[in-house]
Amino acid sequence: MACSLQKLFAVEEEFEDEDFLSAVEDAENRFTGSLPVNAGRLRPVSSRPQETVQAQSSRLLLLHPTAPSEALGLPDLDLCLPASSTPSADSRPSCIGAAPLRPVSTSSSWIGNQRRVTVTEVLRETARPQSSALHPLLTFESQQQQVGGFEGPEQDEFDKVLASMELEEPGMELECGVSSEAIPILPAQQREGSVLAKKARVVDLSGSCQKGPVPAIHKAGIMSAQDESLDPVIQCRTPRPPLRPGAVGHLPVPTALTVPTQQLHWEVCPQRSPVQALQPLQAARGTIQSSPQNRFPCQPFQSPSSWLSGKAHLPRPRTPNSSCSTPSRTSSGLFPRIPLQPQAPVSSIGSPVGTPKGPQGALQTPIVTNHLVQLVTAASRTPQQPTHPSTRAKTRRFPGPAGILPHQQSGRSLEDIMVSAPQTPTHGALAKFQTEIVASSQASVEEDFGRGPWLTMKSTLGLDERDPSCFLCTYSIVMVLRKQAALKQLPRNKVPNMAVMIKSLTRSTMDASVVFKDPTGEMQGTVHRLLLETCQNELKPGSVLLLKQIGVFSPSLRNHYLNVTPNNLVHIYSPDSGDGSFLKPSQPFPKDSGSFQHDVAAKPEEGFRTAQNLEAEASPEEELPEADDLDGLLSELPEDFFCGTSS
């Protein structure tokens, strides 16, 4: 039988349930004889070293149902949770005493001799008559170091209370029983190098445990084998304690109170690999509470790390839907799992808030997903800053969409832009004046003010532009714009005396738009229509106007215009005439013109005499060649008519 089982467990791949059950039945038929044949059951025993102080150790046993459960015809598989031995006063062969429930785990470091129990010896001891309800058991005992002496009666009893765990599907229940007595441990044997004995195991699940004893209100139910069959119910505060036997699958536990167990996953590992036992699952605050029939005291659960230290540890809680798993990777690789099907409902286990996570879970290779690949790829890439937004940010002069507008092609700023000339009539009658503007604007400043009418005006009046007291300096175009725009120093917005040259003249239906200039700058203005009619031939580009009391019109802070009327005009120096043409004697110069009055008095008498002679010789009947009948009629009108109209 041992050889057949070794061959069965020696395979490194997963085998079917029928193969395992057939081997077990064959073994039972050989060794049991007249005993009734039933499905073989595994009794994995913990391989964790026990405390030296404690005299007895509990095992993870696979028990058979009692007589009442057999009457129902339900064979079951009982998983006895290993627990520390109770005091000698409480342990009795006939009745089962209270025993503390301890999570059994396998230490990663193995010391001392390793023990192995053969199937023949186990069957020989389990075949002793104890009760008519007991069945033969198959016990596979894991490797263990014997720290303290183990004592126990020869007769096999139920080791301890069955601590059951509910499974997810209906009819699935995990029975866990704890007995106060343990079977004697067989002598240790050396490992065989060529043959690897496969042993059923349940991997330790206690990854991180919390210290502290379990409250006494939670106790395990006790089940008597000889006298009566109690219904122990292990109640926990949380509904789902899942088991995770390896990476191949997990066993979630639903919230049902008592359901029969249908499937239990076992993992078979080689003899050289560490064997781990089933550990009761509970959270930091969740404990096990016994049924009303149970009156035995309960000791707190202890984690494998605290067995030698004597301190209790509880697993860390997790989410209720999470499943506890046993790692499937050891030094030998993956282990095949054998599903068994016990069917005896005895008790149920409710899990605390969550279940602990196995300590070996962190050693598993992380699952590579598309999201993980994208994160790694994005982290490895060097960030590239966009060039287009940065370029736009540099060109934006102020917030808003208008800040992206390009600069003007001419390079002129808003401060330099002045009010444009009035629009030209659409009929195009004044196109010839536009031609004059282009022709006159081509002359340079030196040619305009170094000779011609401007030089004639200065020589006639004896003016010097470099004299600070001269009106050519104090009331130049630049000074007028500065005083008017910035300083507001012009009295009644009028300039006392001023001399300007016509740069361009654009006639309209009413007035004419003129651009005046002098050596300091340019300025826009208007010429009254009466003055245009009177001095039509003299008012042309290049003529120099001598003005007095000129009004300055300022529609805005940046735009200023000179308004030239017949009352403001003193003399016109035409580019065609040498000395220039003066006004008629009926329009005398004002006496309060300041320096301009002294300049006019200093002029030679020949100039006035020449002007008077020209007027005396001219008669109303004598007309100039260019004059027509309309000009003759206008010349016959009295002067008061023009003065009244202009005013």
UniProtKB/Swiss-Prot annotation:
> What is this protein's name?
Homologous recombination OB-fold protein
State the associated disorder.
Ovarian dysgenesis 11: An autosomal recessive form of ovarian dysgenesis, a disorder characterized by lack of spontaneous pubertal development, primary amenorrhea, uterine hypoplasia, and hypergonadotropic hypogonadism as a result of streak gonads.
Acidic residues: bias regions? 618-631
Q: What does this protein do?
A: DNA-binding protein involved in homologous recombination that acts by recruiting the MCM8-MCM9 helicase complex to sites of DNA damage to promote DNA repair synthesis.
Which residues are modified to Phosphoserine? 47
Tell me the Gene Ontology biological-process terms attached to this UniProt entry.
DNA damage response; DNA synthesis involved in DNA repair; female gamete generation; interstrand cross-link repair; male gamete generation; recombinational repair
Looking up InterPro entries in the UniProt record yields:
HROB
Modification sites for Asymmetric dimethylarginine: 285, 295, 329, 337
Q: Which organism is it from?
A: Homo sapiens
